[in-house]
Amino acid sequence: MTTHEETRAPAAPRNGAAGAGGWPGVAAITASLFVFLTTELMPIGLLTPLGESLDVSVGTVGLMVTAQGVAAGLGVPFIVAWTRRVDRRKLLTALLGVLALGNLITSAAPNYPLILVTRMVMGFASGVFWAIGVSMAMRIVPERHANRAAAVVMSGISIATVVGIPLGTLLESAGSWHTTFLIWAGLSALALLAVAVTVPSLPSANAVPVREVFGLPVRNGSLRVVLVMVVFFVLGHFGAYTFVRPYLEERASASVGFVTVVLIVFGFGGAIGNVLGGRAVTRSLRGGFVEGGLLLIGALVLLLTVGSDEVGVIAAMLLWGIAFGVVQLSQITMTLAAAPETFEAAMSLNTMAYNTCIALGALVGGLFADHTGVTSAVWFGIVLVGLAVLLRSVTGRTTASAS
């Protein structure tokens, strides 16, 4: 069984650059990532008002993240394989159509069960986007700019956390959560139009049948290790991050305005982390992940110790964002490096693990929040991220060898 350890993601199979070097299409795909991610994580900034409006607990509202994550995770390997003959531009526009309609339904939904079902349907679309989006961007620019295109698309994560989620919180405070989701339905429709106009026709890249997708971790030891690390990391991070708002409201008596500031600070930290992560993974994939993970643990410990000190909270959230940016880029690069010849299938498995664990992290964090207090959700994050770092530390030296 052959394993791989590389410091760069492999170049994607090409279909020729689009007009203007393909960069308008890259921008459209980045905008798509923005609306997909903000839609998925929007409830994190709206837990309290959603719970009050729908008359459910904070932990129950957290299931909105859980439902979308479960659907995204469990459905993506099958949908990517089943649509391997579908033009990727057509597929992406269809996914954005589902997202726009889902946000529209959510904005007008009269009850929580309808919202939950709608989130699950949107989750299927979100999962497929994560599996195909980056590779699409890499293929529509000249080959020498492929890695740069991937980095631009991934910057959508930072944009979403800096602007999107805090903006959703701000819009809710100025109006209502209904208005927030209605606006996001419009943004999803605009992203759909941008993709339709700027992204060229693209066949699937290295897609394989379903049975081969699930056989990849069996045959590829490096990919198997990376996927387990993703499980631990995402469980820990989102188990804690999903409940940032109620944690700050309980421990620091935080206002909506301060929570918004904190989320923006976290997003800026993520942007810094993306830059630092790019340098770290070029030097060492293992080192980048371990360093980012240790910094994240330190940030969570700091958050627990500063109490109601607003400066301390901001510092902790900035460090948390930086760490998240480093680890996020590291785990994606490790996935692509572990399976360069089947990267679309490998990314579908990564997406399955990642989104399922967003869901499980929110679920377990919600159980802790409801039964033992929101502080325990932060401790849960520390333990699980620690397991991810430990696994990477003890396996990183052996993944380059053949077994």
Regions found by a protein language model. Give the residues of each.
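Conserved MFS/SLC helix-loop-helix module at the cytosolic interface between two early adjacent transmembrane helices
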Residues: L74-P113
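Cytoplasmic helix-loop-helix junction between adjacent transmembrane helices
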Residues: T118-I157
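Helix-to-loop junctions at the C-terminal end of transmembrane segments
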Residues: G75-R88, G273-L285, A369
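Helix-loop-helix hairpin linking two adjacent transmembrane segments in secondary transporters
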Residues: Y112-L114, P142-V199
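C-terminal transmembrane helical hairpin of 12-TM major facilitator-type secondary transporters
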Residues: G287-Q331
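Helix-breaking motifs and short loop linkers at transmembrane-helix boundaries and internal kinks
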Residues: D55, D87, A108-L114, S253, ...
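Paired small-residue
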Residues: G102, P113-M122, V311-L319
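Juxtamembrane intracellular "pre-TM" segments in multi-pass secondary transporters
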Residues: P10-G21, T198-L227
